[in-house]
Amino acid sequence: MRTDTPQAVNLADYRPFPFAIETTRLVFDLHPTRTRVSAELSVRRTGGKNEPLVLNGERLKLVSIAIDGRPLAAGEYGVDAERLTIAEAPDAFVLTTEVEIDPSSNKALMGLYMSGGRFCTQCEAEGFRTITYFPDRPDVLSRYSVRIEADGKFPHLLSNGNPVASGSLDGGRHFAEWSDPFPKPSYLFALVAGDLDVLADKFITMSGREVALRVFVDPGQASRAAYALDSLKRAMKWDEEAFGREYDLDLFMIVAVRDFNFGAMENKGLNIFNSSLLLADPQTATDLDYERIEAVVAHEYFHNWTGNRITCRDWFQLCLKEGFTVFRDQGLSADMRGAAVQRIKDVRALRARQFAEDAGPLAHPVRPSSYLKIDNFYTATIYEKGAEIIRMLKAILGAPAFRKGCDLYFQRHDGEATTVEAFIACFAEASGRDLSGFFGWYEQAGTPSVTIETAYDAAAGALTLTLTQSTSPTPGQPDKKPLPIPIAIGLLAADGRVLRDTEIVLLDQAQMTVRWDSIPEPPVLSALRGFSAPVNLSTDARPSDRYVLFGSDTDLFNRWEAGQTLARDLILTRAAGAPDEVGEERYADALGRALVDDAAEPAFKALLLALPSEPDLALMFEAADPAALHAARDHLRTRIAVHLGDLLRRLHGEMQINGEFSSDAAAAGRRALRNACAEALSADPHAENLARLLGHFGAARNMTDMIGGLYPMVAMGGVPREKALESFHHAWRTEPLVLDKWFAVQGRDPNPDALERVIALTQHPDFEPTNPNRLRALVSTFANFNPARFHDPSGAGYAFLADEILKVDAFNPMTAARLVEPLGGWRRYKPELGDLMRAQLERIVAHPNLSKNVLELASKALG
């Protein structure tokens, strides 16, 4: 049992750092086990005379320390496990330190570490302190110059900014020097050294400047980086057109690494990417991989302005860069891949991750007020809900005023570390609007619930809407205030005609009433169009109204939403023991009509075919029964497969593409619908369907179709599963990114023996627990996306996850902490399951030498 109590960091305690670090000169003498790092800091006092200089530093061996060239005696400084302190520092001086570190033993993958025989870094949020002594906080901006010395077997020596010198050294070594003219915080520092292939291109900015583009990858992988490089050029062009942002250095580099805790990192001029989000070709990457690469390349590039040029004053302001940048990358994806389809995908992800977060013990505001480890706040709330707040701001202000606010923010705060308050102030000033109430979205946790009741007066031709809002208590916030919620509303007639186009109603109080005149007939309400606010909506709509929306709504998000709501209600009523056989048949008929709508794109139809997920359905209950939900959902899947079998088989054939592979949205949409039909048909595995599915998998000529065929085979179990998995592994056993997919498909296996198989897979020769991609592919997929088997009545699934968390925590606390979340929802499940989940959380918290990362999340989950 732990006896120490880690100290929380509180927003209220923020104080500016009392010194400026005007320039930082770093010299790296790279060696896998004994790297020497020399740091020369130009320091100037900006705070009180009596304040000491306190620098962060962890796992560093101090070799030397000097001020203005004079070595310090032992009594002139102090060093402990987390910091270096100089009690009596001069007002202006040059501090020189030399430390020794061991990159090869760094399995936490924070700071400087080895991956695939190369050196690389990850410094956000607090990794730089494991490289050298420094004020490792985002409000200390410094101009960096870097010299890297290494053996010739590491031919590429890369860092931030522009290259300024390179050459040979004695003993087969060489060097490179880099200079970054833009002040940056330590979390944006980056270094890569290794044997890499490079793919080169250029981009001409809107002012006519030529920027060299370089993507560095493992030898032999350059062709797989072509799509990422093309995505980068599209992102650079889009940001110029949409936000007026131009790139500022002469060189932009991206490096792919296999071992990486995050998806990617926006280091100034030297982005480092998880290889799973950079490398793609039709044979090894799915359409989803292509989508993610396009979005993440854009996200990290967009950070050059929303994160790098303007950064966060402190880590409580993390949403300032992440929420805004997610909003921006979603905008690019909408323009590239279709606004409605992209919006549906974004909202599905928001509900699956962020709504669940808001509904549980880990709920926190978009701008938190305290933390133990900031690593734990890289959450869906910060990112996705943060983006939704920006989207609402644009809806409330209108596009022109929103753009004025963005321009003012970029102009006013360029080169600063700033706050959410300063951000919102720019939009208030640019629009002339009072946005003080809007700030509540940043301070208040929880998902608001909005109710709309309608009353139609036929004689007067008037519709009255009564809107109410409320937010349930969340940890530390028992009382909630009304928030300004933009509700996009339109009206349809019973035959699907448009009666009233979309209008924004701003619900900014607990209850309000809106009256609309000149409504000639009883309307069907289409509310929260485009998912205009991150809320749970309840209306007095009848099933017949929802079928009108499902068949005719001009807002495609709400058309999809109506279908999801109808399916959800049918699944929930069956799970509760009151099946609606007539309703299930009516739903299947309506779905069939939607699937033959020639005006609808295949990508949209694929989304219509996907039933609500079991985790999303569980959020509808106070004491969910995963087994009952799984059985009820499977029943509806089977009803659809039987009722629409001929149509599904016809669409499956029609959507086949025989020509050359294209990654564009139209071709991806056809593949998505074809694979959705295959998965739907697997719910009715008679001989004709089985033969079709075997043919789908066997004839697949790209990874999208191969994975689309593999999962139905796995779901069937028995001989089809074993043969398909064996053949896939044999074909792709030397491709790490494809093997991740092989593990992930088995993590989703719905068969009763799935848990036993997943546990066995952790002993498979290809399972790499120290690689976050492989760990997430199997363990995280099982715990998050296979609820029927994770929630095994014996509790064995929970024990397995707890075992993995404790194993991984010993060497990679950040990745271990991200595995805690599936146990955190224990209150939402029936007591016999919830008690077993809670017991595993208690076991985790009681474990000796537990990291702060895991302790914080597990303790909060227990409440």
Curated annotation (Swiss-Prot):
Cofactor note: Binds 1 zinc ion per subunit.
Residues holding substrate: E124, G263, A264, M265, E266, N267
Site features described as Transition state stabilizer, chain residue numbers: Y383
Gene Ontology BP annotations: proteolysis
GO molecular function: alanyl aminopeptidase activity; metallopeptidase activity; zinc ion binding
Gene3D superfamilies assigned: 2.60.40.1840, 3.30.2010.30, Neutral Protease Domain 2 (1.10.390.10), Peptidase M1, alanyl aminopeptidase, C-terminal domain (1.25.50.10), tricorn interacting facor f3 domain (2.60.40.1730)
Top EC class of this enzyme: hydrolase
Catalytic reactions on record: Release of an N-terminal amino acid, Xaa-|-Yaa- from a peptide, amide or arylamide. Xaa is preferably Ala, but may be most amino acids including Pro (slow action). When a terminal hydrophobic residue is followed by a prolyl residue, the two may be released as an intact Xaa-Pro dipeptide
Family recorded in the similarity comment: Belongs to the peptidase M1 family.
Protein name, as recorded: Aminopeptidase N
Organism field: Caulobacter vibrioides (strain ATCC 19089 / CIP 103742 / CB 15) (Caulobacter crescentus)
Gene: pepN
